[in-house]
Amino acid sequence: MELIFLLYVLVGFVAQLIDGALGMAYGVSSNTFLLSLGIPPAAASASVHMSEVVTTGISGFSHWKLGNVDWKLVRRLLIPGVIGGVIGAYLLTSIDGNIIKPYIAAYLLVMGGVILYKAFTLVPKKKMDEYHGPNVSWLGLAGGFCDAIGGGGWGPVV
C-alpha cells in the first residue's frame, strides 16, 4: 500500500474525529489537509463531498430516526442550498486552481475560527420560530455556495 494512500486515509480519519466531536467541520478540516498536500482545489472539494455523501447520509438518517429533523427548515434551506452549491461548483471549476487557492485558504482559516468559536461558546437556545425568519433561504444559498467552493463550511455558515 502506498504511503500517500495511507496519508489520505489518515486525513479522512482525523477529519471525521473532529466532526464527531464538534458536530461539524469535516469538510473544512479535510479540505484544509488536502489542499496542504497539494491537491488542486476542485479535486479536493469533489473528494470531500464524495466522502461526505456517506458520512452525512448516515448522520442525517440517524437524526431522522431520532426525530431531530425540522422539516419546515429543511424545505426552506434545500433549494437555495442546492442552487448555491451548483453556482459555487461551477465557479470553482471555471477558475484556475492556482488563482483561487489563496482565497480558499483564507476562507478555510476564517471557517476554522468560526468553528472554534462555536465549539467553545455557550449559545442560548432559540425558539424554533427564530430559525424560520425571512433570511434563512439566503443563508442556505450562501452556505451552499461557500461549501462548494471551500470544500466545507455548510455547518459554520448555516
Stretches found by the model and what they are:
Residues 10, 14, 50-57, 75, ...:
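Hydrophobic residues within alpha-helical transmembrane segments
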Residues 1-40, 125-158:
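Selected transmembrane alpha-helices and immediately adjacent juxtamembrane segments
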Residues 81-89, 97-120:
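Selective transmembrane alpha-helices of multi-pass membrane proteins
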Residues 1-5, 49-62, 109, 156:
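Hydrophobic, membrane-facing alpha-helical anchors
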Residues 71-80, 103-104, 128-136:
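Cytoplasmic-side transmembrane-helix entry/capping segments in multi-pass membrane proteins
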Residues 1-6, 35-43, 47, 90-101:
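Helix-coil boundary and interhelical linker segments in multi-pass alpha-helical membrane proteins
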